[in-house]
Amino acid sequence: MKTVQFCFLFCCWKAICCNSCELTNITIAIENEECHFCISINTTWCAGYCYTRDLVYKDPATPNIQTTCTFKELVYETVRVPGCAHHADSFYTYPVATQCHCGKCDSDSTDCTMQGLGPDYCSFSEMKE
């Protein structure tokens, strides 16, 4: 019984005290307006949990900064979108996370909304793999 209690307490401690913000594989849809279709590519991005809290009573003197699992470092990769017209720009550059951390969401480079369209959203009806 003590082993079960220890395991339970250890899991609770791990969930509360330790962040699990890490690199994960995702599939994103890239689209080009001149090509009129999307392609799916695999990349890495940050996902997981970060310690955060939302105060019941807001104090203007104390900033309430929510942390989120976001990239610490990233690189950019470029792919050629096949099947585009010759006059169209057939190259697409996308970010690839190389290191993650729990930090403030930077709205200059990241979609910080509560619920976005998702990485696999395509505005065209045709999706090519």
From Swiss-Prot:
Cell location: Secreted
One GO term describing the cellular component: extracellular space
Pfam families membership: Cys_knot
Glycosites: N25, N42
Keyword Glycoprotein in record: yes
Top-level taxonomic group: Eukaryota
GO molecular-function terms, A-Z: follicle-stimulating hormone activity
Entry-linked SUPFAM superfamilies: Cystine-knot cytokines (SSF57501)
GO biological process: follicle-stimulating hormone signaling pathway; G protein-coupled receptor signaling pathway; positive regulation of bone resorption; positive regulation of gene expression; positive regulation of steroid biosynthetic process; regulation of osteoclast differentiation; regulation of signaling receptor activity; Sertoli cell proliferation
InterPro entries per UniProt: Cystine-knot_cytokine (IPR029034), Glyco_hormone_CN (IPR006208), Gonadotropin_bsu (IPR001545), Gonadotropin_bsu_CS (IPR018245)
Region forming the signal peptide: 1-20
Cystine pairings recorded for this chain: C21-C69, C35-C84, C38-C122, C46-C100, C50-C102, C105-C112
Alphabetized UniProt keyword annotations: Disulfide bond, Glycoprotein, Hormone, Secreted, Signal
Subunit and partners: Heterodimer. The active follitropin is a heterodimer composed of an alpha chain/CGA shared with other hormones and a unique beta chain/FSHB shown here.
Similarity field: Belongs to the glycoprotein hormones subunit beta family.
Function noted in UniProt: Together with the alpha chain CGA constitutes follitropin, the follicle-stimulating hormone, and provides its biological specificity to the hormone heterodimer. Binds FSHR, a G protein-coupled receptor, on target cells to activate downstream signaling pathways. Follitropin is involved in follicle development and spermatogenesis in reproductive organs.
Protein name: Follitropin subunit beta
Species, as recorded: Aotus nancymaae
